[in-house]
């Protein structure tokens, strides 16, 4: 969510070079560390968990955060870069807690049915959630009238800053609306879930008791012994993936800015880079629906997760911070690098998450879903910390 709004944050932090260079890695690190911590805590709270309540709480928290972000684009503009970075990181912290609640609730809830396609649906939904912010950011930028090409450089910079601010306002407001719609869409699912549990266990006094009675508390070590290859694969997969946002917000079109159409200006090209990656990710996750599947071959998935690191050097061939590209092609960057890196992430991540239920007992599936989600977030956290090494590349 925060990554696709990079042009807006670059405008807010432009008077502090240190923050401008490292805000992306700071956002990623705070987000993933908080997410991992919340997932570990929630994973240890299996016996009394109400997963539908966790999902609803996450959506309410997201709505509050996105409203505050929308307000911040128009008010408190005189806040220093350091002050606004602090506010942004608090918002990241809050959304990461919400993400932990939602991921834990959704994966555990879906895993309890023992149907891999339910996990695949969640993974695909996450990919769609990655595509929509990029699309919203691009549309919001293009919706603003283009600047006067005859204006001075100072005027153009000021106009670009205002455009990024308006785009960010529309962007965060759209996220608020989507979160509200999702919250209302969740209520029928919760009611259906309650009816299923009540019909299964009419002897118990409440739906929450029915949920808890059928739940088996499983230790992390027990799950690791059964799922170590898949857990390692999903960890490495997402650790490698976390380098892409750092490079994406640095890479601009090979077409000179004074000759580039508006679609290739940094304000739109950076979101297009995120969109290309997320579309590849969506395609990769959907490809797991094909009859050919590798989720029953965890060692092969582990080897593939290591080989996937070969995508990272390809970013060095692109136009980082407009310093020139080795391969002077936006097509190469968007389709081969971003699209390919995203597609392999979607396919590998989904295959690992879907395969977990095949290697545990039925009573352990719910815990296995939460366990795999923890490894996924742990990979994101490790990758975000390692991505600081790439922050200084230009």
Regions inferred by a protein language model and the residue ranges of each:
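Loop-to-transmembrane helix entry/capping segments in MFS-fold secondary transporters
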Residues: 18-22, 104, 111-129, 267, ...
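A late C-terminal transmembrane helix in Major Facilitator Superfamily
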Residues: 330, 334-343, 352, 357-392
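A gly/Pro-rich, aromatic-decorated transmembrane alpha-helix motif that marks the paired
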Residues: 40, 127, 131-146, 378-393
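Membrane-interfacial loop- and helix-cap regions that link adjacent transmembrane helices
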Residues: 7, 16, 64, 72-91, ...
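Small-residue-rich segments within alpha-helical transmembrane domains of MFS-like 12-TM solute carriers
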Residues: 96-104, 241, 342-350
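Eukaryotic endomembrane system proteins
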Residues: 100, 115-233, 237-242
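Central cavity-lining transmembrane alpha-helices of secondary-active solute carriers
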Residues: 26-47, 64, 131-134, 271, ...
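Eukaryotic helix-linker segments that join adjacent hydrophobic helices
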Residues: 26-97
